[in-house]
Amino acid sequence: MAKLLGIDVGTSGCKVLLLDEQGRVLRQASAEYPLSVPQPGWSEQNPEDWWNGVQRCIAEIGEPNPDAIGVTGQMHGSVFLDSEGSVVRPALLWNDQRTAAECEEIDARVGADRVRAITCNPPLTGFQAPKVLWLRNHEPEAFGRVRQVLLPKDYIRYRLSGVYATEVSDASGTGLLDVPSRNWSSEMLDALQLDSTWFPRVYESDEASAKTSGGSGLAAGIPIVGGGGDQAAAAVGTGAVAPGILSVSLGTSGVVFTAIPGPEYDRAGAAHTFCHANRGWHAMGVMLSCGGALRWLRDTLYPGDDYALLNEEAAAAKPGCDGLTFLPYLTGERCPHNDPAARGSWSGLHLGHTRGDLARSVFEGVCFGLRDGL
């Protein structure tokens, strides 16, 4: 029976699964890595931390010759590589909000209506295109060294194979893909004066994109499929592959997701329209701080504890938290409030509130935020 290796490069950590062809989990491993916040609203990681985590997980799985490998992970991030394939600077992540001016620059250079017609989305601070412009505007020395721009999961593909490649679902979140035609937009790249050779070949999610080069605990020659952005990949796994089926996924962010009949721009700007991993299209509403809000709460109010105590105290608190309300906009927000400057807060706090009330209010704030997006 075939054995398949799945790799997920998340924001808080990576996960690797060994599956059989029926989808049964044979082995699994995970590893955490740090998140850097150099300034409020900024969010960065070292791509080497992703790679080291994936290597540890592959070693723990202990299967050197799976029949195929699939890659998924956090979307939108920008990994800048030089002519030697080395990382130029820490990656700017999906929840990094520093690029508001560059989003305005994109609309000014391309035209707001054309941007939305081509990409089916407004330029958003989390997307890759404004991050590339930010690097050009603010770190010209680093920008001058760039020869390739990858998404996070595609950096792992590169380290496994030596091949630069991406696929349609993740590339949709760059702000540079022609979403209806499912390939890079020369109009966007030309208007923004970006070198098309910096952006890798785009595959469909189910196409073979590369083969392992050997090392890192894996044999050479194992096919690596295109894979998918984390949300599209999760939707395939949960069956959200046809219109009328809705999925909700919770990680560092939270997403409400549904397949749609074709590419159509949401004129309210609240939902994204992307290529789906099943060769169709999908719409999704993204809330930036879901599990991320809980991790912040754990690290801040429960230092040294795992989530078990946090969950226990939150469960013991009364629904409504005696009037305490938490707004979970810790890194700005996208859906339905597209505002990178939005910030979280507690309101209704009084002396009678306990740590458990604070914990439960975070859960409730996340739940109502997702309902707001729905």
Identify the meaning behind each predicted range.
Residues 23, 46, 69, 96, ...:
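Residue-level signal for inorganic ion chemistry
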Residues 31-32, 94, 288:
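A generic structural motif
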Residues 13, 204-212, 228:
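Glycine-rich phosphate-binding loops at beta-strand->alpha-helix junctions
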Residues 1-89, 101, 117, 145, ...:
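N-terminal glycine/serine-rich phosphate-binding loop of ATP-dependent small-molecule kinases
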Residues 59-94, 119-128, 157-178, 201-204, ...:
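Short beta-strand-loop/turn "lid" adjacent to the catalytic site in phosphate-handling enzymes
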Residues 5-7, 100, 107-120, 124, ...:
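Active-site core segments that coordinate phosphate-bearing ligands/cofactors
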